[in-house]
Regions:
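C-terminal capping/extension of enzyme domains
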Residues: 1-15, 19-20, 45, 88-101, ...
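Short amphipathic alpha-helices and their capping/turn segments at secondary-structure boundaries
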Residues: 13-19, 62-71, 107
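Short, hydrophobic/glycine-enriched beta-strand segments
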Residues: 18, 23-29
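Short hydrophobic segments within beta-strands
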Residues: 25-27, 119, 150
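Short, solvent-exposed loop/turn segments at secondary-structure junctions
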Residues: 30-34, 83-86, 122-124, 153-156
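Short, surface-exposed acidic-centric catalytic microdomains
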Residues: 35-95
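Short glycine-/acidic-enriched loop or helix-start segments at secondary-structure transitions
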Residues: 35-38, 125-129, 159-160
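Internal catalytic-core helix/loop-beta-alpha segment
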Residues: 73-132
Length: 211
């Protein structure tokens, strides 16, 4: 990937990986330039989302970013608070987070996941006005889903290691419970309007950057 190709990806929107009735909808801050250039979430080489997802027990093996479409088969999905790609999350304005929070609430209400997991507590605080929020389960619900704030897996987040993040993600998994048997179902991303072939777990009802 050349620097020119990365720069050309600025402000690009990456389609969600979603389905109705997910166990967990993971929500990043916004796409990195690498994610926008490849179309694969959490694609930056320094991002630890995929190894943490595996080590915590959400997936039986470590998926590659290019294998993201397998996630709905495990009852998992990915979206973002802010849709547009930037080189760093600090390029985003507070109002973008608040507007993204409103879009996310509507999206969650439409898709009906059991849990919304925001990977970045600072983004969660800004988007939803929860200034005192801490890592872990939250008291509020969003769009009918329970909420868990997770540490940002970006390599720039030096406060958390892969091991300590995996422990926190495993706490969420314990709260979510085991996966059901998935069945195929195509769905359309409410955010970007792009179709992704996904699946719906039949155990549920209803339908930083540096990522």
């Amino acid at each position: 990937m050349t620097p020119e190709e990365l720069l050309a990806a600025r402000d690009r929107v990456v389609p969600d990986v979603v389905a109705g009735g997910l166990r967990v909808l993971f929500c990043g801050i916004n796409p990195s330039l690498m994610t926008a250039a490849t179309g694969h979430h959490f694609a930056h080489p320094g991002n630890r989302f995929w190894p943490v997802l595996h080590r915590s027990g959400f997936t039986p093996r470590q998926l590659k970013p290019s294998e993201q479409d397998q996630l709905p088969g495990y009852g998992l999905g990915i979206t973002n608070v802010v849709a547009r790609a930037t080189a760093r999350a600090d390029e985003l304005e507070a109002e973008e987070f608040r507007a993204g929070g409103r879009v996310l609430s509507a999206k969650v209400e439409e898709l009906g996941p059991l849990w919304l997991a925001v990977v970045g507590v600072t983004a969660y605080r800004t988007a939803f006005g929860e200034r005192r929020a801490r890592i872990g389960p939250q008291e509020r619900t969003i769009g009918g889903a329970r909420v868990w704030a997770l540490p940002n897996p970006s390599g720039l987040n030096a406060h958390w290691t892969v091991a300590t993040m995996a422990d926190e993600y495993a706490r969420l998994l314990a709260a979510v419970g085991p996966a059901g048997t998935p069945e195929p179902r195509p769905t359309r991303s409410p955010q970007g309007g792009s179709t992704t072939v996904t699946s719906t777990p039949n155990s549920q009802p209803g339908p930083s950057s540096s990522r």
